[in-house]
Amino acid sequence: MSNGIWQDWSVNRQDLRMKFILGSFRFAQKLHRWPKAVRWLAAPYLFVYQLLVWWELGIELNHKAKVGPRLRLHHGYGLVVHEAAVIGADCTLRHGTTIGNRRESADCPVIGDRVDIGCNSVIIGRIKIGDDAKIGAGSVVLHDVPAGCTVAGNPARPVGA
């Protein structure tokens, strides 16, 4: 766990708030992996995590989500990541972004490595975002995005050459 925290901190050097949020998130993830028989011992911390990070700071970074190392958060406020979402390594998330389900609870995106997601983007449903993709600000992504592709708009469509 500590290795994951240091990796996250290394790419969020300038922002103490994001370091606090990511450190709290990684610790909550670690506690959630405890065996079910003793997981109740983690309940007070998980409650405080939700109280401070979710309710007070407005960042719903669910500790059940699978998030790779070196996650970059720019501002982060208004961020929502569903518990069934998968986010790869070296991804960047900006404020106002929603990554979640469309219908069923488990119908959540799988986001590859090195994906850059612009502010106020919505990525919902059982879709895949390929490695090195870019999601433009304000985009609504409802379909798969190939690796290396840049998409923007509502609904999101490929842009550029």
Q: Where in this protein do the model-derived segments appear?
A:
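Terminal amphipathic alpha-helical/low-complexity segments used for targeting or macromolecular assembly
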Residues: 1-57
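Secondary-structure boundary/capping residues
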Residues: 36, 58-62, 150
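Short, composition-biased local secondary-structure segments
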Residues: 55-59, 100-101
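Left-handed beta-helix
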Residues: 63, 68-69, 74-77, 82-83, ...
